[in-house]
């Protein structure tokens, strides 16, 4: 369950928004500060239309989405909590050219205004910023939603995207295995 994974990873904190003030004491209109509740760290300055999606909310919808047999593998934060992510291992394996490919689902949420909530299927096991970038860049399908008014209502789209990614991986495996089974002669290659 995602809640337990968040607790074990130390990501079970909340984000609060506060007004932003200039050194003169004047409120700066149009901006808010995203603050981590446990230590009052500023995670980012965002526009006033930015809607917070708590870590628990961002990852809770995945519990039902993932279903039986899915295991949360790892979770972490980058840049002092500005970006949080969670990785789940899917029990299904794809055999491609005789190699077992184990797919993962990576979930990413930012609190600094730098990015949307993203969900992607990937064969890359995320452990740091570089592998997170690789996983999201190399994914065949990525669902994302900006931190705006309707972000939570768009979660059904994530389910659809992941179903398409699953279908893509299955089809890719079949196509590669079919190509591998075809015999080519030198004559056919040179033609």
What are these regions (language model features)?
Residues 1-61, 65:
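Feature for intrinsically disordered/low-complexity regulatory segments and propeptides
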Residues 60, 66-191:
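Intrinsic disorder/low-complexity polar-acidic segments
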